[in-house]
Amino acid sequence: MRKLNLIISFLTILLALTLILSCKGKTKSDSPNASKKFVLITMDSIDEHWLSVKKGAEDKVKELGNIELIFRAPAGKTDPNEQTRMAEDAINQKADAILLAPSDIAALSPVAAKIKEANIPLILIDSAISTEDYDAFLSTDNEAAGELAGETFAKLVNGKGKIGIVHAQPAASTAIARGKGFETKIKEIAPDIKIVSVQYSDGDKARALNIATDIMTANPDLVGFFTSNEGSTIGVARAIEDMGKKDTVMLVGFDKSQDTIRALENGTLKATVVQNPYKMGFDGVQMAFDILNGKKVERLIDTGVNVVTLENIDIIK
């Protein structure tokens, strides 16, 4: 009898230890119904493009429920070092998923490797990295969008003349791809167009204005500009307006904002290639959610573009 009691006592202790250890090893993230923490890191919190990404993500989070969305962005304009620090913070805070719009194709790749090592799903938004350390990538087909801008631009300037180009950041995959697409198409269909200057504004409107003013001053016979992001587009549009050249200097830009709508309406901007940043944020959250729930997702998603002019401006109002 005593032996039986000892066996029962031993089994009771063993069962208790098993329960304690199993509870200790279980975290919030182990339960499919536990609240999840998603971190969204964009290039800045100034351009309407990134605010649209944020709005899309917020709306999807509300729809899904039980998700905390943390929005992070450098205080000023693009800062890859600050983005890296924010991503490392998200890893340390045990984020369940990270959505990242990398401002530098190379500089953000090392932290992407850390995210992968931490077994955290990484969804790239808008821009690429130089490695394959991500789970999904939602973006415009930027090279094709650049080609579309080139076709539009060539028609506006009748296939000839001097032009300037203003991008945001030289190391951003979006600027690289859009510039490549634009220049390739121009060489193909309008070889008499001469690119006299390619400059970078860091997406800052005031800097883009100064750059465009200098280019027009140095080239009085300039026929137009191509700009590959919202900040550059608005800065160049303001320079064209300030110099009274909206009838002689054609501008084809990128992105949608209240400022681009006004520039289309006042004639300083002739066309803008409009992306779908809201969809990037909205679908990005859904993809992260699906990955966490064991579902397969498409790795590359083209979120599409439209060329908007004064004639079809209602589609972005």
What is each stretch, according to the model?
Residues 34, 173-174, 185, 189-192, ...:
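Hinge/cleft segment of the Venus flytrap/periplasmic-binding protein
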